């Protein structure tokens, strides 16, 4: 599915333009942030034909100079287009371009922008150092934790909102298609490892009236899951167990008919993934189904989706843990099978964001 990486058909002049976009990327990102936060993007988006710099500046109580430089940068990166005027001396009239439309209206783009701005931007400044030492040094902008997961509940409110918005936007959209696959074998006891806010557990309980879900997560996170389950009246059907899967002394409980991990294994290195799955194997029976839901960058239908996943890998490098990434199908599957499992099913293009749902059993 990633044939677009085997061909380089870009004309030289277009390739040079792409290079300039990279050169000025920090400025264009900040320009878009300003256009959004100052209301300029929305103002131009609501007016089809008559958005002049003067009108926008007056409406938003901003200087014409400030609005002008931002609008001109918006032209350069495709956010805005100009409306032709019969009078050459008439002021330029701006309208929303196709790129601007997605920046203003597309929920996925908003989620990615907020995540980049609120979670990644400041910490990514010294990426070279992170690559060299294998530690998420950028996390220091928020706290002194070894990984971001230890401090999720303590992140600043805006960063926390953007982090969970990013995490849930993608995986949640795959849930409706994933549920029938997972419940085909009618599990009575399902373990959700890394269950975060209990969204999957709640979805399972609403889908199947007989299932009990046990959420295994870090001690600082399970209180959030418990509160959300209680709000839905599901405290009896959703239980929690504090587990740090990287602790060499930790164990996964026995008794699960199905084990679920959604956007969880990408939080770990390949060797850590194998170690985690070995713990699951020790607790599993021959009929335990292990489900892994992940967006794999080499299984994407669109180049933009693969690009977004590759960029997300850098978040893991500089902010999350310093050693994981968004994986390819083969490398993730091999890491799981190295723990003594065998791939039984692979469902790709699950949900509108092209997730892969993999089912494993003990060899």
Region locations from a protein language model:
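Alpha-helical subdomain
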Residues: 1-82, 184, 189-363
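Conserved Class I S-adenosyl-L-methionine-dependent methyltransferase catalytic core
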Residues: 4-10, 15-48, 58-59, 65-188
């Amino acid at each position: 599915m990633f044939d677009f990486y085997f061909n380089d058909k870009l004309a030289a002049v277009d390739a040079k333009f792409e290079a300039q976009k990279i050169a000025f990327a920090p400025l264009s990102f900040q320009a878009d942030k300003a256009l959004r936060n100052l209301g300029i993007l929305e103002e131009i988006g609501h007016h089809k034909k008559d958005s002049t710099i003067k009108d926008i500046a007056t409406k938003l109580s901003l200087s014409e100079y400030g609005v002008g430089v931002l609008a001109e940068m918006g032209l350069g990166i495709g956010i805005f287009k100009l409306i032709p005027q019969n009078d050459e001396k008439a002021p330029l009239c701006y309208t929303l371009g196709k790129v601007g439309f997605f920046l203003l209206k597309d929920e996925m783009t908003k989620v990615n922008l907020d995540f980049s701005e609120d979670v990644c931007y400041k910490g990514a400044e010294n990426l070279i150092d992170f690559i060299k030492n294998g530690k998420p040094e950028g996390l220091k902008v928020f706290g002194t934790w070894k990984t971001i997961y230890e401090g999720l509940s303590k992140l600043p409110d805006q960063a926390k909102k953007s982090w969970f918005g990013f995490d849930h936007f993608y995986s949640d959209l795959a849930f409706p298609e994933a549920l029938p696959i997972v419940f085909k074998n009618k599990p009575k006891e399902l373990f959700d490892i890394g269950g975060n806010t209990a969204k999957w557990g709640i979805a399972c309980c609403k889908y199947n009236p007989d299932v009990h879900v046990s959420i295994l997560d870090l001690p600082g996170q399970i209180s959030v899951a418990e509160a959300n389950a209680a709000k839905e009246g599901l405290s009896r059907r959703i239980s929690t167990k504090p587990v740090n899967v990287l602790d060499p002394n930790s164990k996964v409980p026995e008794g699960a008919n199905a084990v679920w991990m959604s956007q969880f294994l990408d939080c770990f290195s390949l060797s850590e993934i194998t170690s985690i799955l070995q713990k699951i194997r020790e607790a599993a029976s021959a009929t335990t189904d292990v489900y892994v839901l992940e967006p794999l960058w080499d299984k994407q239908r669109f180049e933009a989706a693969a690009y977004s996943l590759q960029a997300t890998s850098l978040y893991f490098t500089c902010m999350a843990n310093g050693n994981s990434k968004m994986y390819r199908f083969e490398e993730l599957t091999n890491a799981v099978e190295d723990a003594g499992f065998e791939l039984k099913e692979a469902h790709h293009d699950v949900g509108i964001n092209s997730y892969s749902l993999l089912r494993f059993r003990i060899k």
